[in-house]
Design a protein with these regions (language model features):
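Conserved alpha/beta enzyme-core scaffold
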Residues: 1-198
Length: 198
């Protein structure tokens, strides 16, 4: 399987005004860094041309300046959930220029799967590698990456060459069934692995 390699600016061109975008990662670890900055640049260019541009932003947790900071400064976020901790985001939220839903971050993936928060148009995730058959080896933070990759129409993968390739096999990605079908998580001893490494 071959994958198209594009620049961050080209990747940003796949994201449109009013899209809902799910970002992988958990805190700054594993959060995409280059593509969100390119989205912010695109938003600023659209605003300078007199056109609207703002997206819904869904993340696994707080992020980094390249995502929450850059997008907030560019007035590129219409809706944000769950947890965030960036000063620029807080200022935009408090000035009522961004809708914010302070949901507990552990509820987000399930609520997205239920469809409570609308359609995820694009997933943007950071990865260490992508196998020939399309398995995504995530970086140092997973967050909601598995859920948004399942739900999105398009997936943009930001490869982080600073992550060691030895991260392959590090993860144990498991998504429990949604209620009312959820069962216990079958981890009974520290060495149990119940999910997949990709």
């Amino acid at each position: 399987m071959s994958f198209k390699v594009i620049s961050a600016e080209e990747a940003a061109s796949y994201i449109h005004h009013d899209d809902n975008v799910g970002f992988g990662g958990f805190t700054a670890a594993g959060t995409p860094k280059v593509v969100p900055a390119a989205i912010a640049k695109k938003a600023q260019e659209e605003h300078d041309a007199g056109r609207p541009f703002a997206i819904g932003v869904f993340t696994g947790a707080s992020t980094n300046d390249s995502l929450d900071g850059a997008l907030s400064r560019a007035k590129a976020i219409k809706t944000r959930t769950p947890y965030q901790s960036h000063k620029d985001s807080r200022n935009v939220i408090n000035s009522r220029e961004m809708s914010y839903y302070d949901m507990h971050l552990s509820h987000l993936a399930q609520n997205l799967r239920y469809g409570f928060l609308g359609k995820i148009n694009v997933a943007v995730i950071e990865a260490t590698d992508v196998s020939e058959d399309g398995k995504i080896i995530l970086g140092t933070g997973v967050g909601i990456a598995p859920t948004v990759c399942q739900l999105a129409d398009k997936i943009i993968i930001e490869l982080n060459s600073h992550n060691p390739k030895e991260l392959a096999g590090f993860h144990d990605i498991y998504q429990p069934a949604d209620p009312p079908y959820r069962r216990e998580i079958p981890v009974y001893k520290p060495s149990d692995r119940i999910g997949k490494p990709y």
